[in-house]
Amino acid sequence: IVSRSPVPDETINEHAWLVDDKAGGLSPIRDRTDGQARILHAVISCKWTLRSDRAQNARSEALNLVRNRKGRTPHIMVVTGEPTPSRISSLALGTGDLDCVYHFALPELRAAVNAHGNADSNELLDMMIEGQRLRDIADLPLDLTV
């Protein structure tokens, strides 16, 4: 789970006057020092491999968070080391419950599939990457800045 704290008005108004006592008073990003909870920014599910039951767990975890949230929908992501593109696609090309699937060794997976995989595996892997449904783990911190 990745969360963030609410921000004081001084920080929000640092570069331009955006909020005061009359504007934006209900936004959860504003620190009102009344013991408000942290803001849920992202949920990252880590699955070493993706058998069908594990893939379904990641999807149902995401749906439960979305249904029970208050406020905006957090980023919902999966990190995996799954070596087969077909299993990765069960999540990456799913119903849109997840923002993205991240592979901890995507360059190595691409090289292995290019060297030893069949044409269908290569095409599936390329489709997930070009469609921005599968990314390398190095992209994850950058994607979390948004």
Regions found by a protein language model. Give the residues of each.
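Conserved catalytic cores of phosphodiester-cleaving nucleases, focusing on short active-site segments
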Residues: 1-2, 40-46, 58
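Short loop/turn segments at strand-loop or loop-helix junctions that form parts
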Residues: 2-5, 105-107
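Active-site-proximal segments of catalytic enzyme domains
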Residues: 3-4, 12-38
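Histidine- and/or cysteine-centered catalytic micro-motif in compact active-site loops
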Residues: 5, 48-49, 81
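Short, surface-exposed connector motifs at secondary-structure boundaries
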Residues: 39-43, 70-73
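A short, acidic, amphipathic alpha-helical segment used as a generic capping/interface helix at domain edges
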Residues: 63-66
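C-terminal tail/extension regions appended to the core domain(s) of diverse proteins
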Residues: 68-146
